[in-house]
Amino acid sequence: MSGQQSSPVYKIALGIEYDGSKYYGWQRQNEVRSVQEKLEKALSQVANEPINVFCAGRTDAGVHGTGQVVHFETTALRKDVAWTLGVNANLPGDIAVRWVKAVADDFHARFSATARRYRYIIYNHRLRPAVLAKGVTHYYKPLDAERMHRAAQCLIGENDFTSFRAVQCQSRTPWRNVMHISVTRHGPYVVVDIKANAFVHHMVRNIVGSLLEVGAHNQPESWIAELLAAKDRTLAAATAKAEGLYLVAVDYPDRFDLPKPPMGPLFLAD
């Protein structure tokens, strides 16, 4: 028996999309619904062995993903169609595998990532929406998207984001490098698009909450820069709701050659 060879282990990466409105966040937790738990259950059924997944970004309760990336290891040799169509057949309708790729041993969905990108969608109309109520955040006061965009540009670069960091954040440092931030209007929709090497807890939603104050002319354009410099969470606005937030893309070194599907969500082009 001692001469038997162990089965080879395969490392697989998946692109995942999900509507987070009915889940208590990404991370598996006891007695509440999580995206991770549903995905691991479906993968384990296809692999016929227990599967544990690692993700690029652990989204909070109510937050959505169109560009989430995960990896897992398995001794099960399956065709790509099993990891896509097969897993999707075992998933609830609000979670889906979008792509599959066999990856090198040194790939890690979280630690190999060089940047994450989020988009926050605001439905800016006097009356609330019904069809996309859980996919957008409703804000009834008229917003000046161009004003919001100008105010946000001070956040680009490496900065201390203490003013936009949740009190319970467990990150060792508040410093993050924002590579891109824009605010654009598409009819009644206002979209905040932000890319950074990583994010402190609630960073995007806290930034959006303060940008809403600028867009509604409750605060001057200079206010965002003042908040950034103050390094005081209590001075900034309330945290924006989870419903409008999407993890839309994760960047990795080119050598991993991962698929790059359209970011979206919905009608939004890249």
Curated annotation (Swiss-Prot):
A Pfam cross-reference name: PseudoU_synth_1
Domain of life: Bacteria
E.C. number(s) listed in UniProt: 5.4.99.12
Keywords of this entry: Isomerase, tRNA processing
Isomerase keyword on record: yes
Alphabetical list of InterPro entries matching this protein: PsdUridine_synth_cat_dom_sf, PsdUridine_synth_TruA, PsdUridine_synth_TruA_a/b_dom, PsdUridine_synth_TruA_C, TruA/RsuA/RluB/E/F_N
Binding-site residues for substrate, renumbered to this chain: 118
EC main group: isomerase
CDD domains: PseudoU_synth_EcTruA
Catalytic activity: uridine(38/39/40) in tRNA = pseudouridine(38/39/40) in tRNA
Gene Ontology biological process terms, A to Z: tRNA pseudouridine synthesis
SUPFAM superfamilies: Pseudouridine synthase
Active site: 60
Molecular functions per Gene Ontology: RNA binding; tRNA pseudouridine(38-40) synthase activity
Similarity comment text for this entry: Belongs to the tRNA pseudouridine synthase TruA family.
Function: Formation of pseudouridine at positions 38, 39 and 40 in the anticodon stem and loop of transfer RNAs.
HAMAP family: TruA
NCBIfam families: hisT_truA
Quaternary structure note: Homodimer.
Protein name, UniProt field: tRNA pseudouridine synthase A
Species this protein is from: Salmonella arizonae (strain ATCC BAA-731 / CDC346-86 / RSK2980)
Lineage: Bacteria, Pseudomonadati, Pseudomonadota, Gammaproteobacteria, Enterobacterales
Gene label: truA
